[in-house]
């Protein structure tokens, strides 16, 4: 067996970097949704786990503690959905060659 061709290895590394940049761009465009309290609180987050929107049913605004609990639950729900979408995109890009959880940790998006 001969040594691997350094030029081929560099091309593969460059391709992998380009794929990961594509994934980063895709994550910017993805939106995940979460809700709690039967839809009384709804949130949307990006694939990069940034909060995009928050909607609270005005009828529950007089119960601050409940609103706080529902917001936390809805945001966590949306963040979990966002992480799942990110893993899916990374898996597609990597073609099974890398562990998506490792990539998400490196991007500060994993648990």
Swiss-Prot record:
Record organism: Chlorobium limicola (strain DSM 245 / NBRC 103803 / 6330)
Subunit (UniProt): Homodimer.
Protein name: Nucleoid-associated protein Clim_0875
Keywords: Cytoplasm, DNA-binding
Location, primary (coarse class): cytoplasm
Disulfide bond sites: none
Family (UniProt): Belongs to the YbaB/EbfC family.
Any single GO CC term annotated in Swiss-Prot or TrEMBL for this entry: bacterial nucleoid
């Amino acid at each position: 067996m001969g040594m691997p061709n350094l030029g081929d290895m560099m091309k593969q590394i460059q391709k992998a970097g380009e794929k990961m940049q594509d994934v980063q761009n895709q994550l910017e465009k993805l939106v995940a949704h979460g809700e709690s309290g039967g839809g009384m609180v709804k949130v949307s987050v990006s694939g990069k786990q940034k909060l995009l929107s928050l909607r609270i049913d005005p009828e529950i605004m007089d119960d601050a503690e409940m609103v706080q609990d529902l917001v936390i639950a809805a945001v966590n729900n949306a963040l979990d959905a966002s992480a799942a979408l990110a893993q899916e995109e990374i898996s597609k890009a990597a073609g099974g060659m890398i562990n998506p959880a490792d990539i998400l940790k490196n991007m500060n998006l994993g648990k």
